[in-house]
Amino acid sequence: MLNYIFIIYSYIFARKNFVLFHKFLYHISLRGLGILNHHNSYLAGEKQWLSRYLKNINNPIVIDVGANIGGYVNDVFEANISSFVYAFEPHPITYRKLNNNIANDKLKTFNLGVGNEKGKLELFDYEDNDGSAHASLYKEVITDLHGKGAVSHSVEVIKLDDFFMDYKIDTIDLLKIDTEGNEYNVLLGVEKYLTEKKIKAIHFEFNEMNIISKISFKNFGIY
């Protein structure tokens, strides 16, 4: 029956005159499905999920890779005040904002990038808005995807496997990754802990930036 309705609808409405109408339906349907609701963590569903997941865990250990100015960190503490958060933010301007925004003795911040190997890399951001939420290790995210001029910062990058061993962190309750296209490399750098099943949950961003880094969901499937 439903297929029959689709066929009839196509006969009547699959016309040039209805293109704008169907584009409108498409975009509001995406929002209804929870896609592209990035205006705040409530609309995105992140806030509700954090509350459900963290509320019954005693003293959860949370790793925030790509902490930006601390919005996610605040949501974590709202979900469970006993959380201990390790937050990584490589951009020097954004890192200062992060520390100014949140004062909590259960938060440790690090002005570091995270990837699949230790070293130094260039972090790119908007020439006219340095310190944005779109800073990326991929210059094309700024120049091609967003069509803007880019400025760069040399940043130190670490592997999480090394960091966890140095800080004697045995189990991670939640690993959050939002690195504007570098999410897969972050996971490659924590392969030991993933293999040993020491990370209970992973929350990562996947969007158009992954076109630039040439990563698909199939890559993440190995984990």
Task: Cite the ranges covered by each PLM segment.
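Phosphate/nucleotide-binding beta-alpha loop and adjacent structural elements of enzyme active sites
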Residues: 1-223
